[in-house]
Amino acid sequence: RERGLDPLNTNLVVADESRTDKTICLAVTPTLKSYGISGRGRLFEVRQRVREVNAWRQARAPGRTLTGSSHQFSELQRDPALAVDFVIAPPRMAYYMEYSTRIYEIYRKYIAPEDIVVYSIDEVFLDVTDYPYDCTAHELAQTIIRDVLETTGITATAGIGTNLFLAKVAMDIVAKHIPADEN
């Protein structure tokens, strides 16, 4: 968001382009993934897949000509004569750690630290089993997600399950693949 880009509408990869074309992409936005690009691929694989997608788009474009390019998914959906482009953002781990800490503090407003399991810089498990909130797990997740968005401007997703495995499956298989709602 600092760059003025909407992460839900921008084709973006986080990768250190200064290393080599074989560098691993640390993150890939959902819009790029929709073109069949792996979330943990190498930069050369992203470029190769974008070339393939653009060849496909060119073959179907009016006059078989691409008239420009865009990294904005909505523009690409509206105009089939645009080539798919993407932004390469260098990783900024100190910045990510700062945001991760801010988000962790939001979780602590609702859940005690001993019930928070940090899985990675951008993923945690919250055990809400013994909390006397007068709401469902889904409603509590919505409340926390809304707080994260309002406080940081970052969208969040939740997977809910009766154990860690089911929560992880709910996150990876279901939650990350459904359209975002207003909550």
Regions found by a protein language model. Give the residues of each.
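Gly/Gly-Pro- and Ser/Thr-rich, intrinsically disordered tail segments characteristic of DNA damage-repair
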Residues: 1-183
